[in-house]
């Protein structure tokens, strides 16, 4: 038996064994499979899997794996039923079947499947360990800087997170929809990544690295300016009992202990959907429409749930630009557009940290000032990003896209 075939058999057995072990493990079920966040992360595997390998046999095997895990966990092991666990069962089954398919594929098909499978696996792993990073940050920074962010938001003349919170409270259906988009973040990431992988593979590596790096890099910034969110700061007072603008102007800002893991600043959800939108360029209209919908509802959800302040979303623009510039691997480090994007991304993010910590009195002079800074941050970030994208779309890449489009029509 050839060594290559032996290795494939070993990898297949390992994948099957790991899938069954994780699917039937009580602790993993409780900590991960029953979690909505992990469920959507695993569901994103199905999207990449079936877009790269759209075979009925694979879909049937995913369904069979889902029913098998559900039957054993609930009928035999008597785990506590959870709706999201069914989505996790399907995603876990896809992860195993996708991996086996990548192992046994050949040539260009194998390369395509590996480029899809490895990021899908890493996305799930990063989601699973995200809580550990946040707990580590919370342990190192027991006091959060929420009062600084709340004071800035109030200097705008309107407390946007409280307004959106009241809208969510008045219209529960909108809150449910917003939460689904918020928790379902892995879905557009998988959709856009697999779409670019099918369109032109050279663009997928920067996207993959940026999506994966957002979490760890974001946690580094959380350690520089940790915050929890207005819902945690005000507790039962959110969203119907905010301070008045006059009261907010007089509060003494200082670090304070707030229960919960840090969630800012910046808003990583906002950074992710910005990257999804930016990397969706060149894809079909329906793919870009889904990316836009996730961006729109994520903005509503981050504010309406009270998990973020408005300024969190503003700082996400230069932060996302920073990540895109770091991952623009097709450009030289000295490329002007890449350097400009990197410098503004880093300076914009850290500059906001400095202003929020030391210059709140400046923003309270007139609401025109904080609004002007917010608009300027967004506009300059978008201009730098557009120039960066223009430079990364080289003639060689465009030629490859045109060549693949032509071959698909013949």
Where does each model-flagged region fall?
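N-terminal transmembrane-helix/juxtamembrane module of multi-pass inner/ER membrane proteins
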Residues: 55-92, 116-189, 392-410
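Interfacial segments of alpha-helical transmembrane regions
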Residues: 113-121, 190-225, 233-234, 290-295
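Juxtamembrane "helix-exit" motif on the non-cytosolic side of transmembrane helices
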Residues: 18-28, 69-81, 103-105, 351-364
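Transmembrane helical bundles and short interhelical boundary loops of multi-pass, membrane-embedded
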Residues: 342-406
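Membrane-interface loop-to-helix entry segments
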Residues: 174-188, 259-279, 310, 314
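Membrane-interfacial catalytic/cofactor-binding modules of polytopic membrane enzymes
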Residues: 219-288
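Membrane-interfacial alpha-helical segments at the cytosolic side of multi-pass membrane proteins
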Residues: 192-196, 270-288, 318-330
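Membrane-interfacial loop-to-transmembrane alpha-helix junctions, especially the N-terminal start
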Residues: 2-12, 49-66, 111-117, 204-211, ...
């Amino acid at each position: 038996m050839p060594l290559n075939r032996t290795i494939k058999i070993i990898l297949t057995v390992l994948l099957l064994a790991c899938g069954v072990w994780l699917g039937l493990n009580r602790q993993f079920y409780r900590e991960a499979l029953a979690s909505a966040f992990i469920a959507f992360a695993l569901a994103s595997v199905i999207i990449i899997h079936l877009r790269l390998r759209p075979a009925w046999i694979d879909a049937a095997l995913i369904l069979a794996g889902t029913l098998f895990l559900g039957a054993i966990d609930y009928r035999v092991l008597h785990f506590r039923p959870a709706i999201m666990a069914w989505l996790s069962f399907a995603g876990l089954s896809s992860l195993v079947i996708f991996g086996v398919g990548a192992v046994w594929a050949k040539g260009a098909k194998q390369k395509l499947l590996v480029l899809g499978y490895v990021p899908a696996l890493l996305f799930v792993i990063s989601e699973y360990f995200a809580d550990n990073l946040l707990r580590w940050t919370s342990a190192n920074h027991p006091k959060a800087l929420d009062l600084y962010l709340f004071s800035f938001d109030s200097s705008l003349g309107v407390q946007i997170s409280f307004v959106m919170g009241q809208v969510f409270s008045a219209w529960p259906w909108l809150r449910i929809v917003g939460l689904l988009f918020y928790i379902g973040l892995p879905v557009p990431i998988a959709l856009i990544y697999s779409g670019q992988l099918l369109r032109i593979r050279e663009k997928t590596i920067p996207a993959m690295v940026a999506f994966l790096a957002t979490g760890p890099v974001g946690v580094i910034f959380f350690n520089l300016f940790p915050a929890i969110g207005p819902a945690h700061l005000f507790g039962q007072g959110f969203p119907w009992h905010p301070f008045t603008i006059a009261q907010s102007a007089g509060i003494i800002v200082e670090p304070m202990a707030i229960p919960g893991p840090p969630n800012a600043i910046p808003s990583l959800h906002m950074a992710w959907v910005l990257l999804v939108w930016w990397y969706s360029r060149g894809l079909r209209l329906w793919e870009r429409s889904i990316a836009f919908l996730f961006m729109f509802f994520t903005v509503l959800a981050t504010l309406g749930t009270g998990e973020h302040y408005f300024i969190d979303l503003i700082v996400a623009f230069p932060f996302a630009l920073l990540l895109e510039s770091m991952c623009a691997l097709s450009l030289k480090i000295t490329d002007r557009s890449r350097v400009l994007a990197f410098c503004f991304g880093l300076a914009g993010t850290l500059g906001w940290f400095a202003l929020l910590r030391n210059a709140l009195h400046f923003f309270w002079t007139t609401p025109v000032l904080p609004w002007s800074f917010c608009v300027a941050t967004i506009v300059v970030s978008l201009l730098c990003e557009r120039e960066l994208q223009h430079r990364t779309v080289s003639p060689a890449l465009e030629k490859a896209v045109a060549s693949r489009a032509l071959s698909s029509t013949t």
